[in-house]
């Protein structure tokens, strides 16, 4: 039996209560969550969902269900007790993929992240915040191993946290940066298992109005790629946080390539060992930081992709991307290692005309050959859905909108998609966007490259 383990942050408690690994509080909202599971095989999947409390006990009897061949299923509300705060492990007889949406204060703020199909003994967290223009972070670490996990969190400011109690198998532990002492406004972290157990992590960034979520990194890359960068685009901006997990400083050049708007340009910074630096945000705003060199023109509109094209000391890097629109919307995603990309990518949640929500598929060819990309969609009732096709050169990106006036018109759709590009490798992210002008209705997640 194959299994898919992932952290699912679920708070169904009354306003004012928090979550933590100690007596500290965490979280600016009261939270609810949904789970979207996609069956990747042409056979019926029998799945079992285990809901673990933070003490390692199961919250409810394991939930068994089936998903049809190449089909998908949404769990909302989730089948756990009211007030559940913990994590989830999904077991399946077929290969599956999953994405979770987090909703704060009755949908006033929203975020999204994908499941983890494996754990690591060491995780990198490139962006944490404490009191940064109203933003703080907290993160959950889940035990994906086979026994109790003892862990240590080392922050880039030189501080560390070593909990006395272990994380029980399948369970998660919360770390709240707002409640921890002596942090700068922006920093990073390394999470390690001190007894060799496998871990996974999800980070939540939030103000009192906006929420972002991304996963901790277990693997690094010399040249991370980012399939969607927005700058000065209807108020949207992007910040990329690149972390150097190596032993020496390295000069990192990021090359920006337009897909819809803008001109190709570059940005160069030196990232010390164990530190992280912010890219994209300042050069496109026209306020480059000291020590930064760039050919990007501030104030110009840009929609495209980005790639690390120079890493002078060949150090291991990870990249996390934040997209935001002032104090209204925000969403985050993990940058990709192109060497782990494949010819197909799975997108477990695609929407159009769904209570005002629609999605966009943002895809990048990270291989060395020009190829034709085709995206197909699971049926929604008897409504026929278009197949999207585009030929992309190496390092070229494309954005497809599932919205009124675009590919789907006014057709309501809630389902999933699979994109294929024979002869090359692709990566993708999905933006979910609602129509509200007062609530944070931007959610972003990474497309999943299935394991062969």
Where are these regions (language model features)?
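Sec-dependent, cleavable N-terminal signal peptides
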Residues: 1-26
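Gly/Pro-rich, tryptophan- and cysteine-flecked surface segments typical
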Residues: 20-452
């Amino acid at each position: 039996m194959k299994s898919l383990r992932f952290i699912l942050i679920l708070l169904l408690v009354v306003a004012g209560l928090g979550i933590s690994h100690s007596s500290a509080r965490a979280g600016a909202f009261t939270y609810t969550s949904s789970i979207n599971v996609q069956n990747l095989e042409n056979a019926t999947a029998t799945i079992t969902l285990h809901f673990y409390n933070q003490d390692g006990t199961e919250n409810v009897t394991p939930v068994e269900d089936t998903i049809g061949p190449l089909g998908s299923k949404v769990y909302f509300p989730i089948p756990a007790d009211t007030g559940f705060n913990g994590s989830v492990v999904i077991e399946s007889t077929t290969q599956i993929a999953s994405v979770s949406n987090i909703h704060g204060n009755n949908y006033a703020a929203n975020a999204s992240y994908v499941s983890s199909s494996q754990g690591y003994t060491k995780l990198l967290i490139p962006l944490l915040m404490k009191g940064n223009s109203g933003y703080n972070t907290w993160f959950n670490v889940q035990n994906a191993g086979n026994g109790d996990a003892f862990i240590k969190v080392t922050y880039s400011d030189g501080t560390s946290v070593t909990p006395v109690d272990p994380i029980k198998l399948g369970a998660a532990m919360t770390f709240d940066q707002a409640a921890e002492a002596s942090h700068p406004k922006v920093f990073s972290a390394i999470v390690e298992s001190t007894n060799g157990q496998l871990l996974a992590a999800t980070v939540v960034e939030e103000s009192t109005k906006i929420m972002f979520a991304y996963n901790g990194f277990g693997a690094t890359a010399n040249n991370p790629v980012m399939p969607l960068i927005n700058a000065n685009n209807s108020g949207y901006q992007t910040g990329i946080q690149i972390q150097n997990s190596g032993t020496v400083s390295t000069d990192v050049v990021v090359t920006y390539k337009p897909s819809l708007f803008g001109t190709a340009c570059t940005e160069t910074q030196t990232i010390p060992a164990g530190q992280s630096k912010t890219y994209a945000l300042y050069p496109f705003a026209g306020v480059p930081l000291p020590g930064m060199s760039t050919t990007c023109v501030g104030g110009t509109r840009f929609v495209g992709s980005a790639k690390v094209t120079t890493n002078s000391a060949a150090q291991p890097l990870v990249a996390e991307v934040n997209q935001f629109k002032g104090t209204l919307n925000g969403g985050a995603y993990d940058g990709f290692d192109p060497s782990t990309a494949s010819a197909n990518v799975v997108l477990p949640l695609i929407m159009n005309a769904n209570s005002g929500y629609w999605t966009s598929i943002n895809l990048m060819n990270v291989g060395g050959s020009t190829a034709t990309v085709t995206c197909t969609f699971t049926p929604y009732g008897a409504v026929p859905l278009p197949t999207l096709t585009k030929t992309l050169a190496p390092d070229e990106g494309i954005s497809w909108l599932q919205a009124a006036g675009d590919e789907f018109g006014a057709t309501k759709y809630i389902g999933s998609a699979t994109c294929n590009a024979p002869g090359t490798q692709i990566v993708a992210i999905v933006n979910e966007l609602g129509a509200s002008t007062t609530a944070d209705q931007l959610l972003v997640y990474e497309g999943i490259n299935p394991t062969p």
